UniProtKB/Swiss-Prot annotation:
It comes from Escherichia coli (strain K12). One of its GO terms (biological process) is cellular response to osmotic stress. This is Moderate conductance mechanosensitive channel YbiO. The chain crosses the membrane at residues 143-163, 185-205, 225-245, 268-288, 294-314, 343-363, 372-392, 432-452, 466-486, 509-529, 533-553. InterPro entries: LSM_dom_sf, MS_channel_1st, MS_channel_C, MscS_beta-dom_sf, MscS_channel_2nd, MscS_channel_C_sf, MscS_channel_TM-2, YbiO_bact. One of its GO terms (cellular component) is plasma membrane. Gene3D superfamilies: 1.10.287.1260, 2.30.30.60, 3.30.70.100. GO terms for molecular function: mechanosensitive monoatomic ion channel activity. Mechanosensitive channel that protects cells against hypoosmotic stress when highly overexpressed. Its main location: membrane. It is found in: Cell inner membrane. The lineage of its organism: Bacteria, Pseudomonadati, Pseudomonadota, Gammaproteobacteria, Enterobacterales. The gene is ybiO. It comes from the Bacteria.
Length: 741
């Protein structure tokens, strides 16, 4: 039975390797070095078929065969041994190697292009030249060209007075600062009229071409080439007239002298005519009438002449144009001045690169090079013009400010300044975004960057979405800060209804709260903006927590300063403008922060004292002031007379209305409060308004001196007693005299 099963598997396995079933993939792979089993012959197949029939005919053998087949089917296949394939090592190239490779690639392509051009010129067949056909085609072509140029020149000459009136009216209106938009509108209007005249000329040219082609498709094709070149070149010349405006100086958007404007307009027009009519008209006609390779050679000669001439014009006028650009930058806004100065340094290299790239493009792709370069140039000029106009609008708006009503300015002193600051920042940001978009559009115009594809893909959409969300975050943060700060400033200011100013304590607390609010809003805004950009702020928060813990251990004095300062403020210990004594220092509080207090002495010295170093302090502006005046009188004087003189001085002082308004209540006479060997002391005390005790004391001293002199009350003087030595002869006593000071 087993040999029958073996033969059966051989018969079933042999065709299985030779037949491929569509849609079914095999998972078992065999080594390529294993040789396939030999194909059984016909006799072996017949014997196997007969044996299989005998097996199936017997119930016992058939059952045994079925069991063996199920056993084989249930046996899992052996897992294939994985092959270890070493990874492919890719050697990274340096920047120098990449530049060398790119240079070699384009150098070989350029060399092959010149070689192919040489082989085509020397080995290609030439078409026979038919003078009669050429003369006929040239006649019809020249007639169309003369009529089209003549018609276009005539209608532009008729429109010249209109241009001049538009320019004069716009310049007159532009003298008024509020009518600055009229001049740009007239410049754009003149450009649109120029394009309409060009469209009219093309329509007339097409009508003339239909009647001047002599029924020849070749002549019609050549005339269509001329009309296409005429449309493209004259459109470029219209752009040149928009920039230089050689015939109507009033419509010239830039400060350029008439001679320079005519010089550059004329030469750039000649250059564009050489390129356009040479590549679009002359080269195709030569290729059609003579030979394609001769047309390619003509293309190379035309572009080489154009490139050499353009480079000559660029470097011949380099210094003059650079100086004009620098002078123009001096009279421009600061934002535009930066770009103009940068452009003045590199304009000749950019212009040279432009014509060199055009030359090489014409070699590699003669049919589309001029179309691409002209299209990219026009788009670039349009992008730069629109970007300059939009940026100029933003710059003019920057010069303007928002002016609030006097009532609003009185209630919210900093609101106008803050609104103008936000508006200025928003306009500057919009101006920078305008420049960035203009740069990307310029790169897209030259095929270096696909701006619209980038904008539609994930990266561009994500960038725009992030910018919009950041703008909204900054907008709401600015609005929130402006509202809260304005409310605080409104509380700090008085209104037209005579609302009194808040106390010094309230002003100090509100100022500290405003500063803390600014820090909190700024921190939250920065964190949210970083999160929107894509920065994971979780490590920043964790790092800030760890850093804060580390700082807390190393900056206990700072924490003590803050806590002590907060409690002193809540207890209304001192405020800005108070006269205080802190330790050995006495002065006026000029500044209070969350960490320290600034005190200025009467000598002008300014001291910064940390809150934590203050253990006790005295405030002279709390409730009342006090004057305790002690006056020493010679003990030989009559006490009643001296006391009466002091009362007379106080009575005269109280009659002074200015001084009387500073005194609270009545003076207190204490009489004699001290007695010494040479004097006795009289005392009088006053209760005054805060910080007015020195004014009262100075006035009192003046009155006391006056009344003591009138009453003959003497101040105490120091006396000496001379005693003779023991055994000495006593001297004659001196006559008594007045004591001397």
């Amino acid at each position: 039975m087993r040999w029958i099963l073996f033969i059966l598997f051989c018969l079933l396995g042999a065709p299985a390797h030779a037949v491929s079933i569509p849609g079914v993939t095999t998972t078992t792979t065999t080594d390529s070095t294993t040789e396939p089993a030999p194909e059984p012959d016909i006799e072996q197949k017949k014997a196997a078929y007969g044996a299989l029939a005998d097996v199936l005919d017997n119930d016992t053998s058939r059952k045994e065969l079925i069991d063996q087949l199920r056993t084989v089917a249930a046996t899992p296949p052996a897992e294939p041994v994985p092959k270890i394939v070493p990874p492919t090592l890719v050697e990274e190239q340096t920047v120098l190697q990449k530049v060398t490779e790119v240079s070699r690639h384009y150098g070989e392509a350029l060399s092959a292009r010149f070689g192919q051009l040489y082989r085509n010129i020397t080995g290609s067949p030439h078409k026979p030249f038919n003078p009669q056909t050429f003369s006929n085609a040239l006649t019809h072509f020249s007639m169309l060209a003369v009529l089209v140029f003549g018609f276009y020149w005539l209608i532009r000459l008729c429109a010249l007075p209109l241009y001049r009136k538009m320019g004069q009216w716009a310049r007159q209106k532009n003298r008024e600062r509020s009518n600055w938009l009229q001049l740009p509108a007239m410049i754009i209007g003149a450009f649109i009229i120029d394009l309409l005249l060009l469209a009219l000329t093309l329509f007339v040219g097409q009508v003339l071409s239909d009647n001047l082609n002599a029924g020849s498709r070749t002549i019609a094709f050549q005339q269509s080439l001329f009309l296409n070149a005429f449309a493209l070149i004259e459109f470029f010349k219209a752009v040149l007239r928009l920039i230089f405006c050689p015939n109507v100086a009033e419509l010239r958007p830039f400060t350029i002298q008439d001679e320079s404007a005519r010089y550059w307009s004329r030469r750039l027009s000649w250059l564009s005519s050489l390129i356009g009519y040479g590549l679009i008209v002359a080269v195709p006609i030569i290729s059609n009438q003579v030979n394609v390779q001769i047309g390619a050679l003509a293309n190379v000669i035309i572009m080489l002449c154009m490139t050499v001439w353009a480079l000559y014009l660029i470097f011949r006028n380099k210094k003059e144009i650079t100086q004009h650009l620098l002078n123009f930058a001096e009279h421009s806004l600061a934002f535009f001045s930066l770009f103009i100065r940068a452009f003045a340094l590199v304009w000749h290299w950019l212009a040279s690169a432009y014509f060199i790239v055009l030359f090489f493009f014409s070699l590699f792709d003669p049919g589309n090079s001029l179309k691409f370069m002209m299209g990219a140039t026009v788009r670039s000029l349009a992008i730069i013009g629109i970007a300059a106009f939009v940026s100029g609008m933003f710059s003019r708006w920057l010069a303007k400010t928002i002016t609030l009503s006097p009532h609003t300015q009185r209630n919210y002193p900093e609101l106008q300044k803050r609104l103008n600051g936000w508006l200025s920042a928003a306009l500057k940001t919009a101006r920078i975004l305008t420049v960035c978009v203009a740069v990307m559009l310029l790169l897209s115009a030259w095929g270096l960057f696909d701006f619209w594809n980038w904008l539609q893909n994930g990266a561009g959409q994500k960038t725009v979405d992030i910018l919009i969300r950041i703008a909204l975050i900054l907008f709401f943060s600015a609005v929130g800060w402006t509202v809260l700060a304005s409310l605080i400033e409104n509380r700090l200011a008085s209104d037209i209804h005579g609302r009194p100013l808040p106390s010094a304590r309230t002003r100090t607390l509100l100022t500290l709260f405003r500063n803390a609010l600014a820090v909190i809003i700024s921190t939250i805004t920065i964190m949210i903006v970083l999160s929107e950009i894509g920065v994971n702020i979780a490590p920043l928060l964790a790092g800030a927590g760890a850093l804060g813990l580390a700082i807390s251990f190393g900056s206990q004095t700072l924490v003590k300063d803050i806590i002590t300062g907060v409690f002193i403020q809540f207890e209304n210990g001192m405020n800005t403008g108070d006269l205080v004594t802190i330790g050995p220092l006495t002065g006026t509080v000029e500044r209070m922060s969350i960490r320290s207090v600034g005190v200025r002495q009467d000598t002008g010295a300014y001291h910064i004292i940390p809150w934590s170093s203050i253990t006790t302090f005295a405030n002279f502006v709390r409730g009342i002031g006090s004057v305790v005046a002690n006056y020493d009188v010679d003990r030989h004087e009559d006490a009643d007379k001296a006391n009466q003189a002091l009362k007379d001085a106080v009575a005269e002082l109280m009659e002074n209305e200015e001084i009387r308004g500073l005194i609270i209540g009545e003076p207190n006479f204490a009489g004699i409060v001290g007695l010494s060997n040479t004097a006795f002391t009289l005392r009088v005390s006053f209760t005054t308004l805060p910080l007015k005790q020195w004014t009262v004391r100075f006035a009192l001293d003046s009155q006391v001196k006056k009344h003591f002199d009138l009453a003959g009350v003497r101040a105490p003087v120091q006396t000496y007693q001379v005693l003779p030595a023991p055994g000495a002869t006593p001297a004659e006593p001196l006559p008594p005299g007045e004591p001397t000071l």
